[in-house]
Amino acid sequence: MDFSIKGCDWSKGTANGFLTGKSDCIVLGVFEAQTLSGAALDIDEATKGLVSRVIKAGDIDGKLGKTLFLHEVSGIGASRVLLVGLGRQDAFSQKAYGDAAKVAWRALLGTKVVQVTFTLAQLPVPERASDWGVRAAILALRNETYKFTQMKSKPDAGAPALKRVVFSVDPADDKAAKVAAKQAVALANGMDLTRDLGNLPGNVCTPTYLANTAKKIAKDWGLKVDVLGLKQIQALKMGSFLSVAKGSVEPPQFIVLQYRGAAAKAAPVVLVGKGITFDSGGISLKPGEGMDEMKYDMCGAGSVLGTMRAVAEMGLKVNVVAIVPTCENMPAGNANKPGDIVTSMKGLTIEVLNTDAEGRLILCDALTYAERFKPAAVIDVATLTGACIIALGHHNTGLFSKDDALAGELLDASREAGDPAWRLPLDDEYQDQLKSNFADLANIGGRPAGSVTAACFLSRFAENYPWAHLDIAGTAWKSGAAKGATGRPVPLLAQFLIDRAGA
């Protein structure tokens, strides 16, 4: 799909190109109380009051989410007009804009429209310019067009008719909007990769499959990749990671993918993604109901790989390293048992009180490995705890960090990207719950504050650099009728790196 940007100041008579230019449809916004947006006023004048007459007749009331097509419109180059309800003008918000864009795309995708002129990006969204509107609209469109049909014998209907979108933006935002469009496409491509990896079944998306995906990203975008196999992992003495992997016939992989966009001496940001490609719980077996969704336990890895693809396509001037420890967590005669004690790469011994708290066991060795890159910051991403879902539900990703500056950057990025996160505590007092009579620490701390104690566990292996942990258990995928991976938190991570790169 092709996206282009054209500057237009509707209030100053510079809209002739939009009024006369050939297009299958032009999208206009209508507020409640029959108030037209700037673009709609110009179109109304060019069509001799058609838009006003339709509104006056009550065919559309401007309520948010309502749409109306006008066909065979004369006086303009577009053959039809799509009116989109925006709600109350004094309550118009970023969310309202996103909802309006979403319903507009849904309406258009149900037609044979090939080329559309989209004017909503110029709507007066508080604290936002039209370049933000372009990015949000492209992401909304790509979200609407995403389908996962790879595993069906007869894939669903093909690509939508819509092929080209022309965005009208404020002339002062023209350059920024072009950058925003490029970034939005790259971000959507990264999110689609993340969703595809998450939606694939565990018998397809194995640790080896993830490793091959990383190799393909490296080949396509000129990145450096190293994939460590069993013997190399053993040589590094990653006993914690290996204790989880040993119960599966699928060989573990330790993926290191490097993007160099800045000076060689510039310290990289390291992203660590949990890559449990299927989590049965091990000997501490999960209930059968809903276990199919444990294919999503690699969404941390998927989001890190998706972010790397997006960053490479954007060409950001920043160095980024992705580390993905990946394996399955399965019950077997040689699998971890409750009460087993394993030795991590750092040398700390861990009492495995619950084999279903395995994500932290593979991440801790990856966090130790990350030290060799002398990182500017390390962010691990994991579907780590059900407790985070109880605490935050499915809207906010859980954010943990003792570094206020890093936490602030991530929260700012989450707001800018529309990929919300919420900071949770990481007080030292919670560490007491991880005490063990027989090892340096236990892998669980009981039911109270389960997401916090999981983060506390990881913090013991991330003491030598600025570190943050993102618990995406509630945000990486959806259940029910809309079941599927969401692609989060790729927008948050990408925005964080955009900000770091100063792009």
From Swiss-Prot:
GO terms for molecular function: manganese ion binding; metalloaminopeptidase activity. Mn(2+) 2 binds at K274, D279, D297, E358. InterPro entries: Leucine_aapep/pepB, Macro_dom-like, Peptidase_M17_C, Peptidase_M17_leu_NH2_pept, Peptidase_M17_N. GO terms for cellular component: cytoplasm. It catalyses: Release of an N-terminal amino acid, Xaa-|-Yaa-, in which Xaa is preferably Leu, but may be other amino acids including Pro although not Arg or Lys, and Yaa may be Pro. Amino acid amides and methyl esters are also readily hydrolyzed, but rates on arylamides are exceedingly low; Release of an N-terminal amino acid, preferentially leucine, but not glutamic or aspartic acids. PROSITE patterns: CYTOSOL_AP. It is found in: Cytoplasm. It comes from the Bacteria. Gene3D superfamilies: Leucine Aminopeptidase, subunit E, domain 1, Zn peptidases. Its EC number is 3.4.11.1, 3.4.11.10. GO terms for biological process: proteolysis. CDD domains: Peptidase_M17 (cd00433). Transmembrane segments: none annotated. Its main location: cytoplasm. Keywords: Aminopeptidase, Cytoplasm, Hydrolase, Manganese, Metal-binding, Protease. Binds 2 manganese ions per subunit. Mn(2+) 1 binds at D279, D356, E358. Presumably involved in the processing and regular turnover of intracellular proteins. Catalyzes the removal of unsubstituted N-terminal amino acids from various peptides. Belongs to the peptidase M17 family. This is Probable cytosol aminopeptidase.
